[in-house]
A protein has these predicted regions:
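Cysteine-centered motifs
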Residues: 6-9
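Periplasmic/extracellular, small/polar-rich flexible segments of pilin-like filament-forming proteins
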Residues: 79-205
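N-terminal single-pass transmembrane signal-anchor helix
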Residues: 16-59, 63-66
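Membrane-proximal N-terminal amphipathic helix
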Residues: 49-89, 95
Length: 205
């Protein structure tokens, strides 16, 4: 659409040339569209970050529930036994004390973070198989710190002997007695993995 615009109004001479209105409107629309896309991009990134954080918290809570359940199930199953002899991943699955969602088939047990879970026995005060251990691998720093500093019980009544914290899959620093629950400073220092390779191990009577 074209209109005429006055070029010069002196001496009564009118010189007119066509102006296309749609050009400025189109440019403004493009800028507005880019602005909207930028806002959508920011919101999308924020939404993904928020979802990821929420999922991490969900998995942490799930893992803590699973560990509590495993401890209770193992202690109940072996309550009439002299010790925990024979307890391992394969038998734990066969005895039905592993939640179905953790059963990876065969002797494989996985946690909510898709890391390996290892159930074994431990020697306490020179008594073989007097305790059992549950090891969680594949933990990120946040999960490691949160779970390490949680109150898993202390004293003989709780049955918790010790906890081991590591920034790798290998066993790390062990805390027991008055060092439990593990302090935030110690947990942050030991859960120093930059990727999800931290691990925790609980030893219970």
């Amino acid at each position: 659409h074209f209109t005429s615009t006055c070029r010069s109004c002196e001496s009564g001479d009118l010189m007119r040339f066509p102006v296309k209105r749609g050009m400025t409107e189109s440019g403004r629309s493009m800028v507005e569209m880019l602005g909207v896309l930028a806002i959508i991009g920011v919101l999308s990134v924020g939404g993904i970050a928020g979802y990821s954080k929420a999922m991490t918290k969900f998995k942490i809570n799930k893992s803590m529930d699973q560990i509590s359940m495993l401890v209770a199930n193992i202690r109940t199953l072996f309550s009439g036994q002299r010790n925990y002899s024979g307890l391992n991943n394969t038998n734990a699955i066969a005895f039905g004390i592993i939640p179905g969602e953790m059963d990876g088939g065969g002797s494989v047990i996985t946690n909510a973070f898709s890391g390996n879970v290892t159930i074994s026995t431990a020697t306490v005060n020179s008594n073989a198989d007097a305790a059992f251990t549950i090891k969680y691998e594949g933990l990120g720093q946040e999960a490691c710190v949160t779970m390490a500093t949680s109150d898993w019980g202390s004293g003989s009544s709780s049955g918790l002997v010790s906890m081991s914290v590591s920034n790798t899959a290998a066993d790390g620093t062990t805390y027991s007695g008055s060092d439990l629950p593990i302090t935030l400073i110690n947990a942050a220092s030991k859960c120093s993995c930059s990727t999800a390779v931290c691990s925790l191990k609980w030893t219970y009577l």
